[in-house]
Amino acid sequence: MAATETPGAAQKRVLRVLALHGYRQNERSFWERTGALRKRLRGRADLITFSAPLLVPDPDAEPGAGDPDSLQDESRGWWFSNPEQNSFDAMEESKTCSGLEAPLDTVAKAFSELGPFDGILGFSQGAALVAIICALKQQGDPRFHFDFAILVAGFKSLSTDHAKHYQQPITVPSLHVIGETDRVISAAMSQELVSHFENPVILMHSGGHYVPACAPQKKVYWEFLDKFLT
């Protein structure tokens, strides 16, 4: 039975946030991994997940190449740092990669078919892609309309193909979530990405490579999101 609204009462707006998963994850696994965060944000923001376009052929990649504890059913990624082996390592410098056309088209399709969105969130490789999307938005790319970005365990892509996206300071309002004991994406790697944003909000937590959602972090999430609810 539907709830009855009080006459004249203003309905509270809930932010819609497009969420990009990490390497070797997918829509379903990231939905499960963000369960605690979605609970903390209930009534303020809804997360909408979707899968990256590239299938990862080898789920047993070398340590440090991807995100641990992911469901292996349809492991996916946004791009490969080594196109010949269809693999990705955030610490691998590469002159070429699998390209951004497919992932950007996938995200643009999500904006078109699932949007509109108030913000965009990314985890690990997804956060690296979010940073690039922020740069494209700033340059006037008409496919991406949003007001803020949340980057969890983000890093700067080491592919020379992506270097152009870091040439100008990124002015999109951003919250960067960094794990002090993250052994997959070190805090130093995340801080390097932060340096490319103007006036970033930084949330440090004592944990590792995951999306934190305990009470202390909730306060920071809320304060950041509330700026866009007015």
Swiss-Prot record:
Active-site residues from the entry: S124, D182, H209
**What InterPro entries has UniProt attached to this entry?**
AB_hydrolase_fold, FSH-like_dom, LovG
Annotated EC: 3.1.1.1
- Enzyme class (EC, first level): hydrolase
Q: Which UniProt keywords apply?
A: Hydrolase, Serine esterase
- Catalyzes what? a carboxylic ester + H2O = an alcohol + a carboxylate + H(+)
* GO molecular function terms attached to this record: hydrolase activity
Q: Which Pfam families match?
A: FSH1
The UniProt family comment states: Belongs to the LovG family.
Describe the function of this protein: Exhibits ester hydrolase activity with a strong preference for long-chain alkyl ester substrates and high selectivity against a variety of short, branched, and substituted esters. Is able to hydrolyze ester bonds within a wide range of p-nitrophenyl derivatives (C2-C14) in vitro, with a strong preference toward substrates of >8 carbons.
Give the protein name, as stated in the record.
Answer: Esterase OVCA2
Tell me the organism. Xenopus tropicalis
**Lineage of producing organism:** Eukaryota, Metazoa, Chordata, Craniata, Vertebrata
